[in-house]
Amino acid sequence: MQNHEVSADDAPKAQRGIQSVEVGGRLLDALARRRKPLGLSELAAAADLSTAQAHTYLVSLTRLALVKRDAITGNYEPGPLSLRLGLMSIERQPAYRATLPHAARLAETVGLSVALSVPGALGPTIVRIEHGGYPLHVNLHVGSVMSLDTTATGRVFRAFGDPAQLAAMAASQAGAGDALAGFERTPQPAPDAGARQAELDAIRARGIERSVDLPSPGVSAMCVPVFDADGRLQLALTVIGSSESIDVGWDGPIAA
């Protein structure tokens, strides 16, 4: 009979790595966990590093475009390379892969722009735009973050998204200002809890939301949620166009 016992010498051994890379990874992990831009001191504490040590690593991470530093606030946030890596991960998700061909066909059929948005650190974030024949006179691009309150996309996330995730997004958006698509320089009074709940219940019942001439005058949109097999919100599909070119009727061709 053969002896199948594994000796200590035969056990898998941990591979050697580069410690400095792993320390830098702690800073990236801290940014991902906090889901908002962080100042040097807060980021260092979250990564369990001294501020001097964190600063040294952040210089290199910034050079690699894994993080970027806001010139005004001095806060650090994920950089362009992190965004590209994140997009690669998103593109492999079943819900995204299933929705992308539909978005492209829809843009071609209706002649309007179609955006796909996923949960991000600051809020719903555009990860893909399919452009139609009609020009879109609004500054939206991959990486644009949508307001949770003033955009159809944001309200769909409020209606169907994970509550803990939404709370983190809302906290991040509270001080984001014009970093958001849909930011209002003269904000409207927030609806009371009852009115907001009624609004979200109506969105859930319809399964679709719209915005008309808001937050950008002359631009309207219709948005639907996309779920995974377990019924969890994965992304939102939003048709956007000039108010003259888009039919925002609940029973119109786009809603259908």
Model-inferred region functions:
Residues L66, I126, L235-A236:
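Short glycine-/small-residue motifs
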Residues V67-R69, L116-S117, V226:
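A structural signal for short hydrophobic beta-strand segments in well-ordered beta-sheet cores
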Residues N3-H4, P135-P215:
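Short, solvent-exposed recognition segments
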Residues G17-V21, L40, N75, G79, ...:
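Short, structured helix-loop boundary elements
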Residues G182, T186-A256:
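Extended hydrophobic
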